[in-house]
């Protein structure tokens, strides 16, 4: 086994299915045979626009597979382990790492962005980043552990949740639906989910949303002004005007959490900013998942999170850019598009 198939980003929309060498293992690393790899929204500019840190590059950070080889310093007992992988590789020695904040590492690497990822038959990863999975968890389900953990981290950024309160999740993509489920698992029964895609809203309702709202047909600020403001609001879509609207939807002393990344400037009206001040709103960001602990596996195993309906499209690795085009087309109502390998 000296070569493998991989999808290699060589430039904008240059996503080439080709043979490349199987990665050599460094000390502390293992070789994972990839079984499933999801497409994250952050992969889109990497593949469509060539927006990676260096070219050529292999993207893909939501994945699972089997350990098939180990490097120096790693127990051979890991061979055969079924696992997902935490993609963040913190340096371990900067000030933030020393304080137990690996997501804030200033010298981090990231599997699928700063180093080769999992849109390939094999990927080399640090053994410490393995997240073991139970035999009753499928590879496709396990590939969702990373986005599940993104949602968990986002919800936990809101602080200790108070029973009997209410929340809004703006955006009904993968992270939005997972955020809704995490809130429910933490005891928030009244979770409103807002989007413009009715098919995705219908799925959110099926999975337990208290109420779903189509923002194409409903004036969202007016709706909550009449029905009552909420305690927590989470923006997961990465849309600038939604992010600016969020303060209008929460009660005084409410909490806003921004999970979605946005490519355009976000502008707050003076009155909205005054609302933040006068209402003493808590405003925070949430950045990716975190490397340890990585609780998405337990949420999945326990049934707190259900992902089967979220994985809407599956492709062989050889499909290449077709999988991304499926994600781009609104008519497909795609949520998690995934490469699945034998």
Task: Please provide the spans of the model-predicted regions.
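C-terminal hydrophobic helical "lid"/dimerization subdomain
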Residues: 2-4, 244-248, 290-342
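Glycine-rich beta-strand-centered segment in the early N-terminal region that forms part
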Residues: 23-37, 50-95, 134-136
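Residue-level marker of beta-strand positions
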Residues: 62, 81-82, 96, 122, ...
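N-terminal Rossmann-like NAD(P) cofactor-binding module of classical short-chain dehydrogenase/reductase
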Residues: 84, 231-234
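NAD(P)H dinucleotide-binding glycine-rich loop of Rossmann-like/cofactor-binding domains
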Residues: 91-170
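Mid-domain Rossmann-like dinucleotide-binding core that forms the NAD(H)/NADP(H) cofactor-binding site
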Residues: 137-217
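Short amphipathic alpha-helix with an adjacent loop that forms part of the alpha/beta core around
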Residues: 218-228
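Glycine-rich phosphate-binding loop and adjacent beta-alpha segment
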Residues: 240-302, 340-342
């Amino acid at each position: 086994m000296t070569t493998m198939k991989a999808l290699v980003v060589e430039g904008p929309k240059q996503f080439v299915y080709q043979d490349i060498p199987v990665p050599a293992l460094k000390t502390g690393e293992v070789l994972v045979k990839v079984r499933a790899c999801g497409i994250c929204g952050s992969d889109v500019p990497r593949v469509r626009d060539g927006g990676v840190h260096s070219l050529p590059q292999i993207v893909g950070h939501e994945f699972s597979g089997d350990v098939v080889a180990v490097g120096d310093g790693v127990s051979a007992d890991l061979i055969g382990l079924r696992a997902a992988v935490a993609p963040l590789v913190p340096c371990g020695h900067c000030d933030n790492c020393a304080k137990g904040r690996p997501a804030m590492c200033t010298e981090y690497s990231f599997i699928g962005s700063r180093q080769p990822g999992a849109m390939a038959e094999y990927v080399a990863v640090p053994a410490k980043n393995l997240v073991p999975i139970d035999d009753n968890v499928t590879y496709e389900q396990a590939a969702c552990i990373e986005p599940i953990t993104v949602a968990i981290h986002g919800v936990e950024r809101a602080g200790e949740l108070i029973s009997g309160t209410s929340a809004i999740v703006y955006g009904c993509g993968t992270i939005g639906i997972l955020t809704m489920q995490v809130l429910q698992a933490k005891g928030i029964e009244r979770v409103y989910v807002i989007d413009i895609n009715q098919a995705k809203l219908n799925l959110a309702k099926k999975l337990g949303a208290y109420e779903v709202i189509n923002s194409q047909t409903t004036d969202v600020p007016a709706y909550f002004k009449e029905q009552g403001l909420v305690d927590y609001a989470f923006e997961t879509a990465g849309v600038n005007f939604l992010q600016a609207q969020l303060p209008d939807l929460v009660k005084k002393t409410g909490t806003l959490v921004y999970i979605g990344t946005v490519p355009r400037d976000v502008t707050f009206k003076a009155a909205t900013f005054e609302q933040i001040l006068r209402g003493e709103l808590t405003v925070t960001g949430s950045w990716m998942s975190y490397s340890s602990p990585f609780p998405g596996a337990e949420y999945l195993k326990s049934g707190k999170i259900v992902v089967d309906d979220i994985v809407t499209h599956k492709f062989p690795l050889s499909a290449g850019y077709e999988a991304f085009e499926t994600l781009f087309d609104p008519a497909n109502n795609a949520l998690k598009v995934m490469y699945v390998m034998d």
